[in-house]
Amino acid sequence: MNSIISHRGTYDSENTSLESIKNCVEKDIGIEIDLRLNKDTVYVSHDPCEPSLFFEDICSYLTNTNVQIALHIKELDAIAPSLKTLKKKNVSNFFLFTIENHKIQQKEDFQIAYYANIMPHDVSDQIIWCDESIKKWFNTETISELKNKNNQLIAISQEISTNCLLDVAQSYWKFL
C-alpha cells in the first residue's frame, strides 16, 4: 500500500502552520513534523529558531484522525515532553524517528522508525524512514528485500530534495 506523507506538514503552503496541518487531516494526507525543545515547550521547526508554532496546538488537529503522523525528533530532549503531549491530547497514530536511531529508548508503547540513509541491515523496527537526500541507495533489490521483511518503507520523494519535473517525481513514485 502506498500513501502520501506531507513534508513538514505543509499542504498548499510553504511553511508548517495550523492551517496546513488542518488541510492535511481533512485531505487524509499523512504528516511529517519536525520537533524541537525550547525550555519546557515543544515547538515545530526544521531549524532552531524562536518558537512560533507549538506542538500542543497542532495536536488539537491530530486527535481522532487516521492520518499517519511522522514525528521527526530534531532534539532528543524533545521526546519525553512530546510523548506527554501526545498522551494528554489522545493522539495515537504516530511514530518517532531521528537520525540518531540508537539514542531513542523505547520505554512506552509507541512506534519508532529506523532512519536510513544507506541500505539498513539487521533492523528490528517495523518502519524504515528511507532518505536518499545524501546518497542514492534504492534499487529494485533493496526495496524488495526490505518489503519481504514486512517493513513499512517511507521514502522521501524526489521533488523534496532536488529540483525536478513532476514527471520525474511521478516516475520515482512508480518505482517505489
What is each residue range found by the language model?
Residues 1-176:
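Phosphate-group recognition and catalysis centered on beta-loop-alpha active-site segments
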